């Protein structure tokens, strides 16, 4: 499923993949803005977080959208205290189909992309 994430994310205008981990961002006002990244799971207390390739963190527009997703299906979407107050949800990749994944990644990109890029992209659809 990570190959699907990569294919979808990199098909979006201006999207790039981080060199050091599985994460995608878009340049906005001179800074890379992340829209999808591998979940860094806290497996053991007092130890560094480790990548969990089965879970993707996805940026959402706001807390309301986050709550809607979290309440929609807890088999697919969840959160953890690290993400409290931050507009992102955690997605179990095995629980969603490619169509849902494409919608989630595209919406996440729309949250972070500069307005001109969003308008061009939406105008072409």
Regions found by a protein language model. Give the residues of each.
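Charge-dense, helix-prone N-terminal extensions
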Residues: 1-125
